[in-house]
Amino acid sequence: MAAAYAVACFGKYFDDRGVVLQTENEGVAHFAQKLYRRCGVQGTVISKERPTGPVYEFSVKDPEEVAKMLALFGHTGKEPTLRIRPENFKCQNCMQAFIATAFLCCGTMTDPEKSYNLEFLSTRHYLSQQLEAMLAEHNFHPHRALRKGANTIYIKAADHIEDLLTFMGAGGAAMRIMDQRMYNEMRNKTNRLSNCETANISKSVNAAVQVQLALSLIHISEPTRL
């Protein structure tokens, strides 16, 4: 249930009208649909064409299904400010699934060849504060800033990003960042010592993270573990 709850908290909206998640990743939209189906709530996935490319929308809008969803998460849908309910986390696996799915819904990561930066973006102030506290509780050392009206929770230290990716179930991506970091350190050391250029090895993981994370969650997010 915790993973499905993250979709509600970090999607486009979540209230008495239902829930909507928009994403450029078709796999994420269908993953959200599968999560809700496992919880006994039926949703739909549609594709919308935009100038920048297709956007995939997962939604629960049928009144009967919306009522089941709200009861499942313990919300009325009329809350003036949306806040995360700790009661929806039964164990450590729930917290892992929630944070990992939140990243699928609103997270980004830069190419580690260029810089180390992992972010969660949300327009919901209190939810962002709570997510920041969750990450801090697990020693991922997050920071928060307001950028263009959106709350940005970001982690810049490579070792903390590696730890978070491993925590979320994307251990392979964490290892690739570690490899790139070691290469960058050796390259910088070599440049300082010999003042020469070294070969540029491409190990981009940005696109791969969401794919691996979704696949990992599909395997670990059984109904008894959400």
Where are the language model's segments positioned?
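DNA-contacting interfaces and partner/effector-binding or oligomerization modules
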Residues: T23-R181
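C-terminal regulatory or interaction extensions
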Residues: N151-L217
